Protein backbone atom coordinates (compact mmCIF):
# COMPACT_ATOMS: atom_id res chain seq x y z
CA UNK A 1 0.00 0.00 0.00
CA UNK A 2 1.03 3.60 -0.65
CA UNK A 3 0.78 6.42 1.89
CA UNK A 4 0.41 8.98 -0.91
CA UNK A 5 -1.61 9.66 -2.99
CA UNK A 6 -4.66 8.60 -1.01
CA UNK A 7 -8.37 9.09 -0.45
CA UNK A 8 -9.32 11.32 2.49
CA UNK A 9 -12.94 12.11 3.29
CA UNK A 10 -15.44 12.54 6.09
CA UNK A 11 -19.16 11.90 6.42
CA UNK A 12 -22.02 13.16 8.56
CA UNK A 13 -25.48 11.61 9.03
CA UNK A 14 -28.17 13.08 6.77
CA UNK A 15 -31.65 12.34 5.48
CA UNK A 16 -30.37 11.91 1.92
CA UNK A 17 -27.11 11.33 0.08
CA UNK A 18 -24.97 14.34 -0.77
CA UNK A 19 -21.54 13.93 -2.39
CA UNK A 20 -19.29 16.08 -4.59
CA UNK A 21 -19.66 13.99 -7.76
CA UNK A 22 -21.31 10.94 -9.25
CA UNK A 23 -18.58 8.48 -8.30
CA UNK A 24 -18.70 9.25 -4.59
CA UNK A 25 -22.48 9.55 -4.71
CA UNK A 26 -22.81 6.07 -6.21
CA UNK A 27 -20.67 4.49 -3.51
CA UNK A 28 -22.38 6.55 -0.81
CA UNK A 29 -25.80 5.31 -1.92
CA UNK A 30 -24.57 1.73 -1.99
CA UNK A 31 -23.05 2.15 1.48
CA UNK A 32 -26.28 3.59 2.89
CA UNK A 33 -28.20 0.66 1.44
CA UNK A 34 -25.76 -1.87 2.93
CA UNK A 35 -25.79 -0.17 6.32
CA UNK A 36 -29.56 0.47 6.23
CA UNK A 37 -29.19 4.17 7.05
CA UNK A 38 -31.12 7.12 5.55
CA UNK A 39 -28.18 9.04 4.11
CA UNK A 40 -24.95 10.95 4.58
CA UNK A 41 -23.19 14.16 3.65
CA UNK A 42 -19.79 13.21 2.19
CA UNK A 43 -16.95 15.75 2.15
CA UNK A 44 -13.95 14.72 0.01
CA UNK A 45 -10.57 16.26 0.83
CA UNK A 46 -8.19 14.07 -1.20
CA UNK A 47 -8.79 11.61 -4.01
CA UNK A 48 -6.79 9.18 -6.12
CA UNK A 49 -6.32 9.67 -9.86
CA UNK A 50 -8.55 7.23 -11.75
CA UNK A 51 -7.55 4.50 -14.19
CA UNK A 52 -3.80 4.72 -13.67
CA UNK A 53 -3.36 1.41 -11.85
CA UNK A 54 -3.70 2.57 -8.23
CA UNK A 55 -6.97 0.83 -7.45
CA UNK A 56 -8.85 4.09 -7.02
CA UNK A 57 -12.26 2.44 -7.32
CA UNK A 58 -11.72 0.10 -4.39
CA UNK A 59 -10.14 2.75 -2.17
CA UNK A 60 -12.90 5.24 -2.98
CA UNK A 61 -15.66 2.71 -2.33
CA UNK A 62 -14.23 1.42 0.95
CA UNK A 63 -13.30 4.88 2.23
CA UNK A 64 -16.82 6.16 1.55
CA UNK A 65 -18.42 3.10 3.13
CA UNK A 66 -16.19 3.27 6.23
CA UNK A 67 -16.80 6.98 6.77
CA UNK A 68 -20.57 6.56 6.52
CA UNK A 69 -20.57 3.56 8.85
CA UNK A 70 -18.65 5.49 11.49
CA UNK A 71 -20.88 8.54 11.03
CA UNK A 72 -23.83 6.34 11.97
CA UNK A 73 -21.97 4.72 14.89
CA UNK A 74 -21.68 1.37 13.12
CA UNK A 75 -18.56 -0.80 12.99
CA UNK A 76 -17.32 -0.97 9.38
CA UNK A 77 -16.46 -4.41 8.00
CA UNK A 78 -14.91 -3.57 4.62
CA UNK A 79 -13.88 -7.13 3.69
CA UNK A 80 -17.39 -8.42 4.32
CA UNK A 81 -19.13 -5.64 2.41
CA UNK A 82 -16.64 -5.03 -0.43
CA UNK A 83 -18.48 -7.44 -2.80
CA UNK A 84 -21.77 -5.57 -2.28
CA UNK A 85 -19.88 -2.43 -3.32
CA UNK A 86 -18.68 -4.26 -6.44
CA UNK A 87 -15.08 -4.49 -5.18
CA UNK A 88 -12.61 -7.25 -4.32
CA UNK A 89 -13.71 -9.67 -7.01
CA UNK A 90 -10.80 -10.26 -9.35
CA UNK A 91 -8.25 -9.35 -6.68
CA UNK A 92 -8.31 -8.87 -2.94
CA UNK A 93 -5.16 -6.74 -2.85
CA UNK A 94 -7.04 -3.44 -2.76
CA UNK A 95 -9.18 -4.59 0.16
CA UNK A 96 -6.15 -5.96 2.03
CA UNK A 97 -4.13 -2.76 1.61
CA UNK A 98 -7.13 -0.74 2.77
CA UNK A 99 -7.28 -2.90 5.90
CA UNK A 100 -3.61 -2.88 6.87
CA UNK A 101 -1.32 -1.79 4.05
CA UNK A 102 1.89 -3.64 3.35
CA UNK A 103 3.21 -5.69 0.45
CA UNK A 104 0.39 -8.11 -0.37
CA UNK A 105 -0.05 -11.36 -2.30
CA UNK A 106 -3.60 -12.69 -2.31
CA UNK A 107 -4.96 -16.15 -3.10
CA UNK A 108 -6.91 -15.00 -6.17
CA UNK A 109 -10.04 -16.44 -7.75
CA UNK A 110 -10.52 -19.50 -9.99
CA UNK A 111 -9.57 -18.47 -13.53
CA UNK A 112 -13.09 -18.96 -14.91
CA UNK A 113 -14.74 -16.92 -12.15
CA UNK A 114 -14.52 -13.59 -14.00
CA UNK A 115 -14.12 -14.87 -17.57
CA UNK A 116 -16.77 -17.32 -18.75
CA UNK A 117 -18.83 -16.93 -15.56
CA UNK A 118 -19.07 -13.27 -14.59
CA UNK A 119 -20.89 -13.00 -11.23
CA UNK A 120 -23.40 -10.34 -10.29
CA UNK A 121 -22.28 -7.59 -7.91
CA UNK A 122 -21.92 -9.05 -4.43
CA UNK A 123 -21.93 -12.68 -5.57
CA UNK A 124 -18.36 -13.47 -4.50
CA UNK A 125 -15.98 -13.39 -1.56
CA UNK A 126 -12.83 -11.29 -1.38
CA UNK A 127 -9.77 -13.54 -1.90
CA UNK A 128 -7.84 -14.06 1.34
CA UNK A 129 -4.34 -12.73 1.91
CA UNK A 130 -1.68 -15.37 1.24
CA UNK A 131 1.38 -13.30 2.16
CA UNK A 132 1.83 -9.88 3.72
CA UNK A 133 5.17 -8.18 4.40
CA UNK A 134 6.03 -4.83 5.90
CA UNK A 135 8.67 -3.27 3.65
CA UNK A 136 11.61 -1.63 5.44
CA UNK A 137 11.02 1.99 6.49
CA UNK A 138 14.25 3.07 4.81
CA UNK A 139 12.99 1.99 1.38
CA UNK A 140 11.58 4.77 -0.79
CA UNK A 141 9.09 4.20 -3.59
CA UNK A 142 8.94 6.77 -6.38
CA UNK A 143 5.53 6.80 -8.08
CA UNK A 144 5.51 8.24 -11.60
CA UNK A 145 2.19 8.69 -13.41
CA UNK A 146 2.68 9.40 -17.14
CA UNK A 147 0.85 12.33 -18.66
CA UNK A 148 -1.05 10.06 -21.01
CA UNK A 149 -4.57 8.90 -21.81
CA UNK A 150 -6.01 7.08 -18.74
CA UNK A 151 -6.61 3.35 -18.89
CA UNK A 152 -9.85 1.55 -19.70
CA UNK A 153 -12.91 1.68 -17.47
CA UNK A 154 -16.30 0.08 -17.01
CA UNK A 155 -17.36 -2.79 -19.25
CA UNK A 156 -14.52 -2.06 -21.70
CA UNK A 157 -12.04 -2.65 -18.88
CA UNK A 158 -13.93 -5.77 -17.83
CA UNK A 159 -13.81 -7.26 -21.33
CA UNK A 160 -10.10 -6.52 -21.58
CA UNK A 161 -9.38 -8.23 -18.25
CA UNK A 162 -11.48 -11.26 -19.13
CA UNK A 163 -9.69 -11.56 -22.44
CA UNK A 164 -6.27 -11.30 -20.76
CA UNK A 165 -7.13 -14.10 -18.33
CA UNK A 166 -8.73 -16.28 -20.99
CA UNK A 167 -5.86 -15.91 -23.46
CA UNK A 168 -2.99 -16.05 -20.95
CA UNK A 169 -0.10 -18.33 -21.88
CA UNK A 170 0.39 -21.06 -19.27
CA UNK A 171 4.17 -20.96 -19.65
CA UNK A 172 4.26 -17.22 -19.00
CA UNK A 173 1.93 -17.58 -16.01
CA UNK A 174 4.24 -20.25 -14.57
CA UNK A 175 7.28 -18.03 -15.12
CA UNK A 176 5.62 -15.10 -13.32
CA UNK A 177 4.50 -17.37 -10.47
CA UNK A 178 8.03 -18.73 -10.02
CA UNK A 179 9.46 -15.21 -10.05
CA UNK A 180 7.06 -14.07 -7.33
CA UNK A 181 7.58 -17.11 -5.10
CA UNK A 182 11.32 -17.60 -5.58
CA UNK A 183 12.55 -14.01 -5.83
CA UNK A 184 10.06 -11.23 -5.14
CA UNK A 185 8.56 -12.46 -1.86
CA UNK A 186 11.83 -13.70 -0.30
CA UNK A 187 13.62 -10.43 -1.09
CA UNK A 188 10.73 -8.46 0.46
CA UNK A 189 10.83 -10.63 3.58
CA UNK A 190 14.61 -10.27 3.92
CA UNK A 191 14.68 -6.55 3.14
CA UNK A 192 17.04 -7.09 0.18
CA UNK A 193 16.38 -3.96 -1.86
CA UNK A 194 18.58 -4.81 -4.84
CA UNK A 195 17.06 -8.27 -5.30
CA UNK A 196 13.56 -6.89 -4.75
CA UNK A 197 14.06 -4.15 -7.35
CA UNK A 198 15.45 -6.60 -9.91
CA UNK A 199 12.57 -9.03 -9.38
CA UNK A 200 9.98 -6.25 -9.52
CA UNK A 201 11.42 -4.90 -12.78
CA UNK A 202 11.34 -8.38 -14.30
CA UNK A 203 7.76 -8.84 -13.12
CA UNK A 204 6.79 -5.58 -14.80
CA UNK A 205 8.31 -6.66 -18.12
CA UNK A 206 6.65 -10.08 -18.04
CA UNK A 207 3.26 -8.84 -16.90
What role is predicted for each listed range?
Residues 1-56, 66-78, 83, 89, ...:
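ATP-binding N-lobe of GHMP and related small-molecule kinases
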Residues 55-57, 95-96:
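Catalytic nucleophile loop
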Residues 77-207:
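ATP-dependent small-molecule kinase catalytic core of the GHMP/sugar-kinase superfamily
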Amino acid sequence: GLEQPRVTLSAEPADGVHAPDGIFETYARQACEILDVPGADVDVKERLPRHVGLGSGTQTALSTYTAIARAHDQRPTPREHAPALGRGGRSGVGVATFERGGFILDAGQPSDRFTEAVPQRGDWQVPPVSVRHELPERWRVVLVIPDATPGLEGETEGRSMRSAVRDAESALASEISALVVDQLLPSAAKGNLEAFGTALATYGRLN
